[in-house]
Amino acid sequence: MTKSELIERIVTHQGLLSSKDVELAIKTMLEQMSQCLATGDRIEIRGFGSFSLHYRAPRVGRNPKTGQSVSLEGKFVPHFKPGKELRDRVNEDEHEEAHT
C-alpha cells in the first residue's frame, strides 16, 4: 500500500474527513516520526509496534561489479519491531486466508 492509497482508504472509511485533511495528518505524523528517529529517540505505538535505531558497525564490503573490497562506515538504520497485537492479527488473517 502506498501513502496515497492509505489516504484514499482513510477518506473512504471516514466520510467526514476531506482528502486534504487526511493527507496533512499523515504527512505531519510521518514527519514527526522521522524527526524523532533522527534525534535518536524511540517511538512506541501500543498494539502496533515500536521504531528505533540499530547501529550497523563499520565493515568491509564488496563492490558487486568489480569484486573489489570497499570500506563501509558504521551507520544507524531504522528498525521496526511489531507489537504482539499486530503479530497476532497478521497471523490470524494469514491463517484465515490459508483456509478459504
From Swiss-Prot:
**CDD domains to which the protein is assigned, alphabetical:** IHF_B
Sorted alphabetically, the keyword list is: DNA recombination, DNA-binding, Transcription, Transcription regulation, Translation regulation
A GO biological process of this protein is: regulation of DNA-templated transcription
Tell me yes or no: is tRNA processing among this UniProt entry's keywords: no
Name a Pfam family for this protein: Bac_DNA_binding
Annotated spans, Disordered: 81-100
InterPro entries named among the record's database cross-references: Hist_DNA-bd, Histone-like_DNA-bd_CS, IHF-like_DNA-bd_dom_sf, IHF_beta
Specify residue ranges for compositional bias: Basic and acidic residues: 82-100
Which terms in the Gene Ontology molecular function aspect does this entry carry?
DNA binding; structural constituent of chromatin
Function text: This protein is one of the two subunits of integration host factor, a specific DNA-binding protein that functions in genetic recombination as well as in transcriptional and translational control.
Which family would the database say this protein is a member of? Answer: Belongs to the bacterial histone-like protein family.
Subunit structure, per the record? Heterodimer of an alpha and a beta chain.
What name does UniProt use for this protein?
A: Integration host factor subunit beta
Source species = Pseudomonas putida (strain ATCC 47054 / DSM 6125 / CFBP 8728 / NCIMB 11950 / KT2440)
Its ancestry begins with: Bacteria, Pseudomonadati, Pseudomonadota, Gammaproteobacteria, Pseudomonadales
